[in-house]
């Protein structure tokens, strides 16, 4: 019984420390208020950070091409992802944000398709009204917020089997591989569920923290399309300078890959048709979904002066659909 009381007290103390820390209370003040050492406070905070990293998206965040063979919404814990985003934004606003997203997996995947055409689902995430943020926030604050935002978006995209192609200012361009020819359902539904989770994380994870700290809230528009007219090209080399164990300089050359194609152009263009915190999909993505998933979309009636893309298979204006909620 005494042991249970002790564990309960320690658990309560731990949660109190984390609550105070997440409320931007310095560790030395927490130590003083709770009458424990600052080192113990910092150890508890660090242990929680490591635990969150393990429990968050890491278990499902390797963008291995084979992940496109699975329905990943069932294994992504959106509640943990939201909590992770809250903690990350808190930490970013208090100190230098971390950005540890590796591009090695992207290069490995693209190397397989170099100098060839490949079927891909393209997902484009664009931050709404970033010009207003630039005009209202100091550059260093805006940079910190965008960096934390981008990291969380990258993690959730990877959790759904996507791979970051590149960052374009305030936008993210990602792709999902189609592992079985003409089997579009899984990569398309993973991209759609990813888009829905991105919006949830922004609304329920990032924005509450920004609001509590007096910063403007964020919103995004997302476009998703799929197609087989995507060429993987190599544009030169990235030169990497490193030191070996003996402090001798080593120079490594890593090929720089990019994707060019109609699908990328359509996905980026259709993003502008979405309302804030909504996403749009092309006809081919919509057709790949089941009836229940289709019911969450409505067709967008867009004038030819705004939208004039022609479907490669139909020869008529390519239809786009918007998420309802």
Language model features: what each stretch is:
Residues 10-14:
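Short, leucine-enriched amphipathic alpha-helices that occur as contiguous helical runs
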Residues 198:
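Serine endopeptidase catalytic core focused on the charge-relay Asp
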């Amino acid at each position: 019984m005494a042991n249970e009381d002790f564990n309960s007290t320690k658990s309560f103390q731990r949660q109190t420390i984390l609550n105070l820390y997440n409320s931007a209370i310095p560790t030395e003040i927490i130590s003083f208020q709770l009458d424990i050492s600052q080192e113990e406070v910092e150890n508890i905070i660090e242990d929680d950070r490591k635990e969150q990293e393990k429990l968050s998206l890491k278990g499902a965040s390797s963008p291995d091409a084979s992940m496109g063979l699975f329905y990943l919404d069932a294994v992504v814990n959106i509640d943990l992802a939201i909590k992770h985003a809250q903690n990350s934004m808190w930490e970013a606003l208090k100190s230098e944000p971390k950005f540890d997203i590796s591009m090695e997996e992207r290069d490995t995947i693209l190397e397989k398709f170099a100098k060839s055409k490949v079927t891909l689902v393209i997902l484009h995430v664009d931050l709404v009204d970033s010009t207003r943020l630039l005009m209202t926030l100091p550059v260093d604050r805006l940079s910190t917020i965008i960096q934390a935002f981008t990291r969380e978006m990258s993690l959730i995209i990877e959790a759904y089997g996507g791979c970051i192609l590149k960052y374009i200012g305030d936008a993210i361009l990602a792709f999902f591989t189609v592992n079985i020819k003409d089997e579009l359902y899984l990569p398309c539904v993973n991209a759609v569920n990813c888009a829905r989770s991105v919006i949830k994380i922004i609304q329920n994870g990032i924005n509450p923290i920004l609001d509590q700290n007096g910063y403007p809230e964020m919103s995004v528009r997302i476009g998703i399309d799929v197609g087989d007219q995507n060429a993987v090209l190599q544009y030169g080399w990235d030169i990497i300078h490193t030191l070996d164990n003996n402090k001798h300089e080593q120079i490594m050359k890593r090929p720089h890959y990019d994707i060019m194609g109609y699908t990328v152009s359509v996905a980026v263009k259709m993003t502008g048709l979405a309302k804030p915190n909504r996403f749009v999909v092309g006809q081919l993505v919509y057709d790949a979904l089941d009836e229940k998933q289709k019911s969450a979309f409505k067709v967008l009636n867009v004038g030819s002066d705004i939208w004039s893309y022609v479907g490669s298979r139909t020869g008529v204006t390519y239809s786009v659909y918007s998420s309802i909620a």
